[in-house]
């Protein structure tokens, strides 16, 4: 009996150890170790953060307007033809990094560099001609209508001089020139109105690239290619407190933005978008700062997913609804005008009055889609999402997509707009996609998941071994119980038992244990 009891106690203890450590302590220790990631100078994480060691796929789609004459003269609904994608390899890195030991932070600028990926772009070459809203002309008119209505008559007089007597707000241009070559804008003039407009543009149009003293140009990528973004960010390194790694705490030396009409739109939330927290729960949003939108934006958990055998959480991102969400009212143009669901204007962000939405007006108000023809929004091709490994916070697979559109419509005192339809006209949309390379997948597997798999086996071995010891103790207990020796009775007693009339028989029978020893 003592051996059986000992086996039961030992087995139970082993099983409890296996369950407690295997399902509780081991995972906790791993999460604690993995979670202690920081941007310590010289560390592998810091090097990866400073420059992503592989190029990101970057794609651009251009919208060609096939009925621009009818749109300009008759106010017809624009008919769009999507041209693309044009592929590029995008390298992302940080520059001018300065570490601050006192508050465990680092300041830096983002820098993107694009290289043409001609093989993927084929059969397109960039020589394709497209008709688009003239970004300088439409941008100038719209910005003035938003901010300085009093200068609209002056702009109306300056348009024929600065834009060579245009008969339309639309422009025919080669795709390459739109993306890199540039749209030339010549301010060489002695006309007072034109000179005044040029003076304003020089001061308030950061999207224009200077060619000479009086000549400028506009392109989508050339001015930004290989140059620092104008916003200097400050984030936590996570050396003193690993839970704060990547947290944005400053922009251009301030602890909040100044682009928008107030809080919470000017608040800095989450990380810089290139590093994420570890030990993520599906019940929490993931916040990050988006440079293109000049705002922090949350990603919402959608479902559990998997990427190349690695368990992941899928999150998606939407623009939001400035017209109904009280927390987004500060993104509205003014007290009386807010864009409907899925749209936000970037005049206060980029200096150009374009409107950001998801491509093809996916997850946006139906009025936007009804205002044009030729779009087919769907989740697979037009949503923003990413898959992230929750224990380490490693992004595994992501697609970030943004469409840029120009507000179109009649603007008082601008002759060229008198017949234009009121619509939001898509201009182009871009996609950044990232897939963690196989060599990094193997690294993640070898340093994390193979350890987890090993521990998973160990915890079951320990638990089942303990259960086996308990089972052995139980078996031994019953074996001992069933194999106890039988004590033979005397012949006299037997005779007494055989004689039911003998009184002493009852007395002896009352003290027998039927052959068992207590």
Swiss-Prot record:
Membrane topology: Multi-pass membrane protein
Bilayer-crossing regions: 9-29, 457-477
GO terms for cellular component: cytoplasm; plasma membrane
The protein, known as: Sensory neuron membrane protein 1
Annotated compartments: Cell membrane
Broad class of where this protein is predominantly found: membrane
Any Gene Ontology biological process: sensory perception of smell
Keyword Lipid metabolism: no
Cytoplasmic compartment spans: 1-8, 478-518
Family statement: Belongs to the CD36 family.
UniProt keyword terms in alphabetical order: Cell membrane, Disulfide bond, Glycoprotein, Membrane, Olfaction, Receptor, Sensory transduction, Transmembrane, Transmembrane helix
Spans within the Extracellular topological domain: 30-456
Glycosylation sites (chain numbering): 64, 186, 225, 316, 334, 381
Record function comment: Plays an olfactory role that is not restricted to pheromone sensitivity.
Single annotated GO MF: scavenger receptor activity
Disulphide-bonded residues: 265-330, 294-349, 332-338
A Pfam family it matches: CD36
């Amino acid at each position: 009996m003592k051996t059986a009891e000992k086996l039961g106690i030992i087995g139970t203890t082993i099983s409890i150890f296996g369950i407690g450590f295997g399902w509780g302590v081991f995972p906790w220790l791993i999460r604690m170790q993995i979670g202690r990631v920081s941007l310590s100078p010289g560390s592998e994480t810091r090097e990866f953060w400073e420059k992503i060691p592989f190029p990101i796929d970057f794609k651009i789609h251009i919208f060609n307007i096939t009925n621009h004459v009818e749109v300009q003269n008759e106010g017809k609904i624009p008919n769009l033809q999507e041209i693309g994608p044009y592929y590029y390899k995008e390298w992302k890195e940080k520059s001018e990094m300065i570490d601050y030991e006192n508050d465990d932070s680092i300041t830096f600028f983002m820098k993107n560099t694009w290289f043409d990926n001609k093989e993927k772009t084929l059969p397109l070459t960039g020589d394709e001609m497209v008709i688009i809203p003239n970004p300088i002309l439409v941008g100038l008119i719209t910005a003035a209508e938003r901010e300085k209505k009093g200068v609209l008559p002056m702009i109306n007089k300056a348009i024929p001089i600065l834009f060579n007597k245009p008969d339309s707000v639309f422009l025919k241009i080669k795709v390459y020139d739109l993306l890199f070559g540039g749209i030339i804008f010549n301010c060489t003039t002695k006309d007072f109105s034109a000179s005044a407009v040029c003076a304003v543009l020089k001061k308030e149009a950061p999207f224009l690239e200077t060619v000479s003293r009086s000549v400028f140009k506009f392109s989508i990528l050339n001015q930004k290619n290989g140059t620092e973004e104008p916003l200097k960010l400050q984030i936590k390194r996570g050396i003193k407190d690993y839970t704060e790694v990547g947290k944005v705490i400053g922009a251009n030396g301030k602890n909040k933005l100044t682009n928008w009409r107030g809080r919470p739109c000017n608040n800095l939330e989450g990380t810089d978008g290139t590093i994420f927290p570890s030990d993520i729960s599906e019940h929490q949003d993931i916040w990050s700062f988006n440079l293109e939108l000049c705002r922090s934006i949350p990603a919402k958990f959608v479902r559990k997913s998997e990427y190349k055998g690695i368990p992941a959480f899928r999150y998606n991102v939407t623009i939001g609804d400035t017209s109904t969400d009280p927390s987004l009212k500060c993104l509205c143009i003014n007290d009386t005008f807010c864009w409907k669901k899925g749209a936000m204007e970037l005049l206060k962000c980029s200096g150009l009055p374009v409107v950001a939405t998801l491509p093809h007006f996916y997850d946006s108000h139906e009025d936007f889609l009804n205002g044009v023809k030729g779009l087919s929004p769907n989740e697979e091709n037009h949503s923003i999402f990413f898959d992230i490994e929750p224990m380490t916070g490693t992004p595994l697979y992501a697609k970030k997509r943004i469409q840029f559109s120009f507000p179109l419509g009649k603007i008082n005192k601008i002759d060229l707009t008198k017949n234009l339809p009121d619509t939001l006209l898509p201009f182009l949309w871009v996609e950044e996609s990232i897939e963690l390379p196989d060599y990094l997948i193997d690294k993640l597997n070898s340093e994390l998941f193979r350890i987890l798999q090993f521990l998973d086996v160990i915890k079951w071995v320990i638990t089942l071994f303990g259960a086996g010891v308990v089972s052995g103790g139980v078996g031994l207990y019953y074996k001992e119980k069933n194999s106890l020796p039988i004590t033979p009775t005397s012949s006299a007693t037997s005779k007494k038992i055989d004689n039911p009339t003998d009184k002493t028989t009852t007395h002896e029978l009352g003290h027998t244990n039927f052959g068992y020893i207590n």
